[in-house]
Amino acid sequence: MFRDFASWYHVVFAVDTTQSTATNRIKLYINGEQYTWDGNTTQPNQDQQLYWNVGGTYYPYIGRRNGGDYFDGYMAEIVHIDDQQLDATSFGEFDTNSPNIWKPKDLSDLTFGGNTSYHLDFEDSSSLGADVSGQGNNFTVNNLTSIDQTTDTCTNNFGFGFN
């Protein structure tokens, strides 16, 4: 799916299990393009409650799975918005001068509804898990220190099509 593992990618998972059509329950966008699930992809049941929206009983991990599987890469920003299924255009847009280039948007106009919404921008090296959405859903950072933060130079922070 990803041709260049060193490239910047903009990934949006849009989830709404209330959708009657199974393939509309989880949508994946990569650099502004919707990914088409193959026939072998299992979608959640209609109205299924998923783990990351069960505030207080399940705490999401970012960059880790099953205790020992860790993400080997960089993350620039993570946003979770509860109670709505937003598409990629809420978070990014195609450049008007270069229509094949997908670039991130300023997220200050987003509405962070629901109890489990958060926005991690990783800008404060002394508090990498700080939620800047105003919801107060701060993360506890493990096995990282302020020296693990890489400063974004704001160059080449765009993506091309992934197909």
Task: Enumerate the predicted regions with their spans.
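Short, aromatic/His-centered strand-loop micro-motif at the edge of beta-sheets
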Residues: 1-10
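Extracellular/periplasmic catalytic domains that process cell-envelope and extracellular macromolecules
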Residues: 4-5, 53-55, 71, 109-114
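Solvent-exposed strand-to-loop "edge" motifs in beta-rich extracellular domains
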Residues: 13-18, 163
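Short beta-strand segments enriched in hydrophobic/aromatic residues
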Residues: 15-17, 66, 124
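Extended recognition patches within non-cytosolic domains
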Residues: 20-22, 33-44, 74-141, 145-158
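Short beta-strand elements bearing conserved aromatic residues within extracellular beta-rich modules
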Residues: 26-28
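Beta-propeller and related beta-repeat scaffolds in trafficking/envelope systems
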Residues: 43-51
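Extracellular glycan-interaction patches encoded by glycine-rich segments
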Residues: 50-75
